[in-house]
A protein has these predicted regions:
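Conserved SAM-binding loop and adjacent beta-strand
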Residues: 2-3, 73-86
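Conserved SAM-binding loop of SAM-dependent methyltransferases across substrates and taxa
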Residues: 108-121, 186-187
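Conserved class I S-adenosyl-L-methionine
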Residues: 96-107
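N-terminal auxiliary segments of SAM/dcSAM-dependent transferases
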Residues: 1-64
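Glycine-rich helix-loop-beta junction characteristic of Rossmann-like nucleotide cofactor-binding loops
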Residues: 91-96, 118, 163-165, 187
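Short beta-strand element of Class I
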Residues: 122-128, 195
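S-adenosyl-L-methionine
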Residues: 128-178
Length: 259
């Protein structure tokens, strides 16, 4: 990736109050804000990390968005899985280059984008999404960050009715009743494959764990991730007054070979 901004690039503009704006550069384009106008031509051909001034003199820092920043700013319909959970999902599910993954509950495509970047060009992600409008938005978001040439197949279908693929390495679920998918996952995954589910409530987790316990899974864990920032300014060092606490529970299980 070049360090020079080009037309078509996604750019994150950050003001002195850390407010962020995601734009796509286009020749002759303009970004309008309460602090004035930024002309896209003032960015195209310039190096990443520069400070640009609006027509009213406000200063904005221009950078390419990281995946975490993109997830927080991208268009969404469904609620997204946030970066604090996406990172642990990639580690707990041991998502590796070349992995074959089934994801259900594609939503706005935040986790899909992270999975695709982790598996690289030799892997594949098949997404099941019951709503066509969510599927189309997810595709736009994925392509907006990774480009069009990605190993992704999003299908508008209900995973509760079954999974066609076989020998999957991973099944990743973000839907209300993942226990209805456990049987399908045992048929679709290879031995040693990993099932991971993201759920907002502990009652859902309990129901899922019951179904997992009745299937040939082992090494089962459930956890949640809490994120707390710190205020560091001179001699003033303390935890932030606010933290990103509960967003969801992560449950992970390994498919075993029955005795």
């Amino acid at each position: 990736m070049s360090g020079i901004f080009r037309a078509g690039d996604r750019v994150l503009l950050v003001d002195n109050r850390k407010r962020r704006h995601l734009i796509t550069l286009a020749g002759g384009g303009e970004f309008h804000t309460h602090a004035g106008i930024v002309r896209h031509d003032d960015l195209i051909g310039k190096p990443e990390g520069l400070t640009v001034r609006t027509t009213r003199g406000a200063r904005l820092t221009a950078v390419r968005p990281t995946l975490a920043e993109y997830v927080l700013e991208m268009p969404r319909g469904a609620q997204v899985i946030y970066p604090k959970d996406i990172g642990p999902i990639l580690i707990l599910a041991d998502v590796f280059p070349g992995a074959r993954i089934l994801e259900s509950g594609v939503g706005s495509g935040a986790l899909t984008t992270a999975l695709l970047r982790a598996i690289g060009p030799t892997g594949s992600v098949t997404g099941y999404e019951i709503r066509d409008d969510f599927a189309q938005r997810a595709l736009r978001n994925v392509h907006g960050f990774l480009g069009d040439d990605v190993p992704l197949d999003v299908q508008v279908r209900d995973v509760y009715e079954g999974i066609d693929a076989r020998d999957l390495d991973r099944v990743v679920l973000d839907l209300p009743e993942p226990w209805r998918v456990v049987k399908h996952a045992t048929e679709a995954m290879r031995p040693g494959g990993i099932l991971l589910a993201y759920l907002p409530t502990i009652l859902q987790v309990g129901r899922l764990r019951e179904e997992i316990a009745a299937a040939p899974f082992g090494m089962v864990d459930t956890l949640e991730v809490l994120q707390r920032g710190w205020h560091v300014e001179g001699q003033s060092i303390r935890p932030d007054h606010r933290m990103v606490a509960h967003t969801g529970f992560l449950t992970v299980a390994r498919l075993l070979t029955p005795e």
